[in-house]
């Protein structure tokens, strides 16, 4: 048990901390990008699909659905930009559905449905969920710090049956 804890202190915990801190940094960059490209109150900011800007939600949603019908299933296809993030269309063969990958510093996945306007709402909801994802990553960092402290304390504890082990080992020898 002691060696496992030492191994976790040296390898696992630092790697996990670095990963979560990278997530937090990426989320902060993406949140800054989104704040640089705000959405007007109860309105649609517009989306660029295949080089054409769409300011109307219905037209943008219909174009997005049309792209799903013609997109290849075997590789991702870059289709435009939304609020400073690149937009890539991908097919998830496991769930048999299309996904939008919104890429900034991090990748934000949106599962697409059959409703044109609903897909645009899903995109916005995914982007509004970034602070929640960042908070979860921060909670994970805090948890890892607690686990590191507990592991350090556990390593300093002597083996409780050390005397019994020594006595029985001596008898066997």
Per-region residue spans from a language model:
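Mid-to-C-terminal oligomerization/interaction "stalk" domains of large proteins
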Residues: 1-6, 66-173
